[in-house]
Amino acid sequence: MTQHSPYSSAIAEQRNQEWLRFVELLRQAYAEDLHLPLLQLMLTPDEREALGTRVRIIEELLRGEMSQRELKTELGAGIATITRGSNSLKSAPVELRHWLEQILLKSA
């Protein structure tokens, strides 16, 4: 059995607070129509591309017409990335999943 040290708990809490700070900053940027410049500042081109790919993965998993292997070929993403997306989608709150279906599959 592994035990987590107070040090690792403190680091995890600090990282969570930093994440929440970023989320609030992004919310404020949207309110002031500065979200695109903020995201371009905060994310590298590769990170922005990876986020776009993840959206496509979630979209296709929700659509349910392709296997994970087909998604790998279609999107050029690693099977581990697709599997993580699938597992995350399975554990997502029902409300979020329904919202994603409405937003991502509305043109389907």
UniProtKB/Swiss-Prot annotation:
Homodimer. Residues 68-91 bind DNA. This is Trp operon repressor. Belongs to the TrpR family. InterPro entries: Trp_repress, Trp_repress_bac, Trp_repressor/repl_initiator, TrpR-like_sf. This protein is an aporepressor. When complexed with L-tryptophan it binds the operator region of the trp operon (5'-ACTAGT-'3') and prevents the initiation of transcription. The complex also regulates trp repressor biosynthesis by binding to its regulatory region. GO terms for biological process: negative regulation of DNA-templated transcription. It is found in: Cytoplasm. One of its GO terms (molecular function) is DNA-binding transcription factor activity. It comes from Salmonella paratyphi A (strain AKU_12601). It comes from the Bacteria. Keywords: Cytoplasm, DNA-binding, Repressor, Transcription, Transcription regulation. PANTHER family: TRP OPERON REPRESSOR (PTHR38025:SF1). GO terms for cellular component: cytoplasm. The lineage of its organism: Bacteria, Pseudomonadati, Pseudomonadota, Gammaproteobacteria, Enterobacterales. The keyword Repressor applies. The keyword tRNA-binding does not apply.
